Amino acid sequence: MSLYEHAALPLASSPSILGPISGGRNRGNIQLQSIPIEFQAVVFAGFGNSLYPLTGSDALPKALLPIGNKPMLHYPLYWLEAAGFTSAILICMEEAEAHINAWLRSGYEGHMRIHVEAPTILDDSKSSADALRAVSHLIKNDFVCLSCDSIVGLPPIYGLDKFRLDNPSALAVYSPVLKYEHITSQSKEIDAKQLIGIEEKTSRLLYAKSSADVGSDFTFRMSLLWKHPRVTLNTNLSDAHIFVFKHWVIDLIREKESISSIRGDLIPYLVKCQYQKSFTVRENIQRFLSSPNNIDNYDGGLSSQEIKINALIAKDGIICSRANNLPNYFELNKCIAKLTPEQRLVDVTVSERALVGADCMVNEGTTIKDNSNIKKSIIGKNCVIGKGVVVSNSILMDNIVVEDGVRLESCIVASGAQIGAKSKLRECEIGVDHRVEAGRIARGERLVDMEKIETDMD
């Protein structure tokens, strides 16, 4: 299966997802080359409100939550390195800075120089464009933005080459909404769909709004339809939170403080500029395009005077999604596990009378005792799985104790939790360091320490 329409890299060998396969600068079958100075890379490492209770005051930062027993941040950094980037700006909140820097020093296996920025103005009420505004002084060229939760199998060089050839003001990557292998009560509540209007012949992005913002009725301006009469409206797409921008866009963001989110504010703003001349005149967009700072990198002239926003859509069945909510996080863990058949059990102690399925990943220092059965699950470091335990279709992070006779089905268990003996939990989310009492029976519940919630609120 090809990764997308014009590429033929097999997904299982894609270095853009799995990271280094061999030493040096050679990743699998791709010899990496450095990206010219024309592009800079920016990675967002936000708070992760939608991943609660895995995130919180005592938890790992969102960027370091494990996916396939590797920190989430591992994947976008290797995606960039696969494109040949040699450096990146990483924007995080102040409370996450020390954790991320520690991992970059001791756990990061790549070769890029990562410049960590933790602007004091950022908090969990700010969004991606706010973060860009805070580091705008560091952005000198056209730039690539992606989130720390973007898990992408598309060879990145394709999107960059498409940007070079089409020369748009912005390029946004979309993918079919992630399909859940196992529907839970939590996944039913997630609606990440957007209404995306694209002119297929030119890949022009002409409409971009969340389905929740539109309701049952929506309108197209006649000026748009006269200029672009063949628009395909997609209702099954979500953004992968990967964007490529011309440099002048950072000047726009710096001035327009009302633009807070790339997805919710900036992209709709730029889309509107494409076909509403009166709007571009009123907003005086021309001054950004003709600024001396925005010299075209390719021909030495001014940036294109036409505002053009393009879309790149990943084919269905390709990993190109965000781990930005619990159902997606759950599903992407399983997707990554399927792509790493090697090193399923790394320095673990497994009883001869225990069963660990071939579809499981178990990390170092973990012990699995007699008569336990682990299937379709990922277990992190230094966990203790007691006797007669059944774990199926679940994710257990690091330093977890599961006592004898426990049944876990379709659960996510955060680091440091302890599950009391003979508990039966299904479709539950267990918070950091939470102690589940023995014999607890629950389905579809969020089990957290209420005292910690009150502390966080204070």
Curated annotation (Swiss-Prot):
It is found in: Cytoplasm, Cytosol. It comes from the Eukaryota. Keywords: Cytoplasm, Initiation factor, Phosphoprotein, Protein biosynthesis. InterPro entries: eIF2B_gamma, NTP_transferase_dom, Nucleotide-diphossugar_trans. The keyword Iron-sulfur does not apply. SUPFAM superfamilies: Nucleotide-diphospho-sugar transferases. Signal peptide: none annotated. GO terms for cellular component: cytosol; eukaryotic translation initiation factor 2B complex; guanyl-nucleotide exchange factor complex. Coiled coil: none annotated. The modification Phosphoserine is found at S291. GO terms for biological process: cytoplasmic translational initiation. The keyword Cytoplasm applies. GO terms for molecular function: guanyl-nucleotide exchange factor activity; translation initiation factor activity. Acts as a component of the translation initiation factor 2B (eIF2B) complex, which catalyzes the exchange of GDP for GTP on the eukaryotic initiation factor 2 (eIF2) complex gamma subunit. Its guanine nucleotide exchange factor activity is repressed when bound to eIF2 complex phosphorylated on the alpha subunit, thereby limiting the amount of methionyl-initiator methionine tRNA available to the ribosome and consequently global translation is repressed. Belongs to the eIF-2B gamma/epsilon subunits family. Component of the translation initiation factor 2B (eIF2B) complex which is a heterodecamer of two sets of five different subunits: alpha, beta, gamma, delta and epsilon. Subunits alpha, beta and delta comprise a regulatory subcomplex and subunits epsilon and gamma comprise a catalytic subcomplex. Within the complex, the hexameric regulatory complex resides at the center, with the two heterodimeric catalytic subcomplexes bound on opposite sides. This is Translation initiation factor eIF2B subunit gamma.
